[in-house]
């Protein structure tokens, strides 16, 4: 008996159907010599700091850094039942070996291995590694199972990624939270991503538009523009001179035959970028839709960083293109050309090939899919047809004219063969760059043309563009790429599988927010995000360092870098950060959340703000506090109210009436005075104004 362990129930059911495990058990399927079960995501996770020492339950600066010598793991509270099922299945005497069928990637490997080790299992493991959930791909995968030991390096890389994130996240979050008196979430990848948004927004705020001017010659069938000028008077003078001249001489006519190559197939990041541009989808939405399509056997594995197919897939491409073209009605009257060599390159495929629709998609009722999945599937189908198409060819004409001693220029573009663009429907990727400039009339050098008019054009320089998810994904993908040697396999921060989650986490934590209309949303930093980047040191927010870590993780995955050395570097960086970091002076003003101020602290003069529990001095070093659940006032039969707190803060005293004494069983009036000690802590004294 073999135990197959998938990542999700839906995947487990697809595998069970193909291998004949058709008898349902409690949390598993059984049949034909197989048991098939699932993990439901991360069943086993790293323990929190307090599991190592109870003192870590409270966040204290003096306890940092927290660097576990022996890592501890725990079963997720929400998935204990499924973990128990898996443990029993692994311990069954008739189970001789296991098949790891979690997602074929770094995180999928980690999910399986952590469960395997937490259960104390020692049985041999084989690996199912597939890029499609189609029945044929599953059958082939089970026929070509690989020894689990081949993926030990992949597991090491996953462990390093998880533990590095824990070390940086736990220590940096506690460090800055303790120093600045509020929870400040810091992450190995999250914070550099935030820093890019903050810096872009700062550049936009600092940008000062500069006006520019130019003269434009108007002919009967076209226009020609002159060079930009900073001074309006200079441009106006040129306009007047051109009007006086009344004509222009054609000094240059240059014609070139050009072509535009078909776009590459999609990897996850390029698909997310295109879906954001065309459809306004967030990166997470695109990943979710594509994952759903994958589990329905309609597209191949989504979390890939490759835009090519493997050499052995070349014979399959023509038939796939044909059935997809007909099924999706992509100009079906004439077969699309298929230049398969354009999309085939095994050397550029890492774990998984590019995302493409499957043959199953060709026979599927697409109208039954949710609209988001329909849109993504259609986008993938169109891209497949375009990617194997012929180049788009066009004639480009550059014309220069002279008038009043100045040069004017225009460009024309005439498409001679639409090629792949006839299937594209909507503009693809650099559409604005590829837009046609229009036809020009027949012109020759030396011709004199009468002017139909001369216009003064005014404009302003543009600020940097705000980040959309498209642009931020691009920035994450290429972060510090200029610092890496040519030929490295992956650059940037995060991975295709994690970038969407990073963006969503920044939004959820309130560091960035989405602004704009339904189609185009911009990612903008909040005050909270700006404040965090202000106080976090360069090594934490640097895309360069994070990209370097990502590169080393990839090398660990390929057995080219020592995992212990990597973890040592992470620990050293964090230890150095804790020892050397000093709180930024004045940053407490930036870090202060909005609150209702009731007055100035009688001890230090800072603002006194209301919170859920009372009224406290905003200066964290000052101990002045008026608790809402105040024992002193409760013994008087009184509750601390906002009005009472205001009187104590601003006047140093408050008059209380109808106070009750349990000892004498009598009511009385009194004046309560507030005094402060050296640390600012409040103390109360009563001044009696007579009994009642």
Walk through the language-model features, giving the residues of each.
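Conserved ATP-binding/catalytic motifs of P-loop helicase motor domains
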Residues: 124, 194, 299
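Intrinsically disordered, low-complexity regulatory segments
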Residues: 1-162, 166, 463
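Basic, low-complexity terminal or inter-domain segments flanking catalytic cores
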Residues: 2-3, 25, 79, 90, ...
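Metal- or metallocofactor-binding catalytic centers and their adjacent structured scaffolds
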Residues: 232-266, 272
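Amphipathic alpha-helical transducer elements in NTP-driven molecular machines
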Residues: 9-16, 33-36, 40, 76-87, ...
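Conserved short loop/turn motifs at secondary-structure junctions
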Residues: 1, 99-104, 181-183, 255-264, ...
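C-terminal or mid-to-C-terminal helical accessory/interaction module adjacent to the motor/catalytic core
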Residues: 93, 135-219, 255-259
């Amino acid at each position: 008996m073999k135990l197959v362990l998938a990542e999700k129930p839906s995947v487990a059911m697809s595998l069970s159907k193909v291998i004949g495990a058709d008898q349902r058990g409690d949390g598993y399927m059984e049949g034909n010599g197989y048991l098939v079960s699932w993990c439901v995501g991360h069943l086993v996770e790293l323990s929190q700091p307090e599991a190592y020492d109870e003192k870590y339950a409270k966040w204290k600066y003096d306890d940092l850094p927290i660097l576990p010598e022996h890592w501890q793991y725990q079963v997720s509270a929400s998935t204990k039942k499924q973990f128990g099922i898996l443990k029993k299945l692994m311990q069954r005497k008739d189970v001789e070996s296991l098949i790891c069928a979690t997602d074929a990637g770094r995180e999928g490997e980690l999910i399986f291995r952590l469960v395997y080790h937490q259960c104390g299992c020692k049985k041999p493991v084989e690996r199912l590694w597939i890029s499609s959930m189609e029945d044929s791909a599953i059958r082939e995968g089970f026929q070509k199972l690989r020894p689990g030991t081949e993926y030990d390096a992949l597991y090491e890389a996953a462990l390093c990624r998880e533990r590095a994130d824990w070390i940086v996240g736990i220590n940096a979050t506690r460090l800055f939270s303790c120093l600045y008196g509020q929870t400040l979430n810091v992450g190995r990848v999250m914070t550099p991503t935030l820093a890019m948004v903050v810096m872009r927004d700062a550049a936009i705020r600092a940008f000062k538009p500069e006006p520019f001017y130019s003269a434009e010659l108007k002919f009967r069938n076209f226009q020609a523009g002159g060079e930009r000028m900073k001074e309006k008077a200079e441009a106006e003078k040129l306009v007047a001179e051109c009007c006086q001249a009344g004509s222009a001489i054609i000094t240059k006519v240059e014609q070139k035959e050009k072509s535009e190559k078909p776009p590459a197939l999609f990897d996850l990041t390029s698909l997310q970028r295109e879906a954001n541009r065309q459809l306004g989808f967030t990166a997470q939405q695109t990943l979710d839709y594509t994952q759903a399509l994958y589990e329905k056997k309609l597209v191949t594995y989504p979390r890939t960083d490759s835009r090519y197919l493997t050499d052995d897939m070349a014979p399959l491409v023509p038939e796939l293109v044909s059935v997809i073209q007909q099924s999706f009605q992509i100009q079906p009257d004439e077969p699309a050309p298929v230049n398969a060599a354009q999309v085939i390159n095994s050397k550029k495929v890492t774990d998984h090939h590019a995302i493409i629709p499957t043959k199953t998609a060709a026979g599927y009722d697409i109208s039954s899919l949710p609209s988001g999945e329909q849109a993504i599937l259609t986008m993938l189908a169109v891209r497949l047809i375009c990617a194997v198409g012929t180049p788009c060819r066009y004639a480009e004409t550059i014309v220069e004219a002279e008038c009043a001693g100045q040069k004017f220029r225009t460009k024309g573009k005439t498409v001679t063969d639409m090629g792949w663009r006839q299937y594209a429907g909507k503009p693809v990727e650099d559409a604005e760059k590829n837009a046609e400039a229009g036809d020009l009339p027949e012109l020759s050098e030396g011709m004199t043309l009468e002017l139909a008019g001369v216009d003064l054009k005014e404009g302003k320089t543009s600020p940097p563009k705000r980040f959309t998810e498209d642009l931020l994904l691009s920035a994450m993908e290429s972060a510090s790429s200029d610092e890496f040697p040519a030929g490295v396999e992956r650059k940037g921060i995060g991975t295709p599988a994690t970038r969407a989650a990073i963006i969503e986490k920044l939004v959820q934590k309130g560091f960035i927010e989405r602004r704009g209309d339904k189609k185009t949303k911009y990612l903008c930093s909040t005050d909270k995000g700006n404040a965090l980047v202000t106080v976090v040191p360069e090594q934490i927010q640097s895309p360069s360092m994070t990209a370097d870590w990502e590169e080393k993780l990839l090398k660990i995955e390929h057995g080219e870098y020592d995992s212990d050395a990597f973890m040592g570097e992470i620990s050293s960086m964090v230890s150095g950060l804790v020892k050397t970091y000093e709180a930024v002076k004045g940053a407490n003003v930036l870090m202060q959340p909005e609150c209702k101020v009731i007055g100035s602290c009688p001890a230090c003069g800072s603002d006194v703000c209301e919170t859920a529990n009372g009224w406290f001095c905003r200066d964290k070093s000052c101990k002045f506090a008026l608790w809402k659940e105040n024992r002193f006032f409760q013994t008087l039969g009184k509750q601390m109210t906002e009005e009472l707190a205001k009187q104590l803060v601003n006047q140093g005293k408050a008059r209380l009436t109808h106070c009750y004494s349990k000892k004498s069983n009598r009511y009385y009036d009194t004046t309560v005075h507030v005094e402060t000690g050296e640390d600012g802590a409040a103390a109360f004294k009563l001044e009696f104004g007579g009994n009642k």
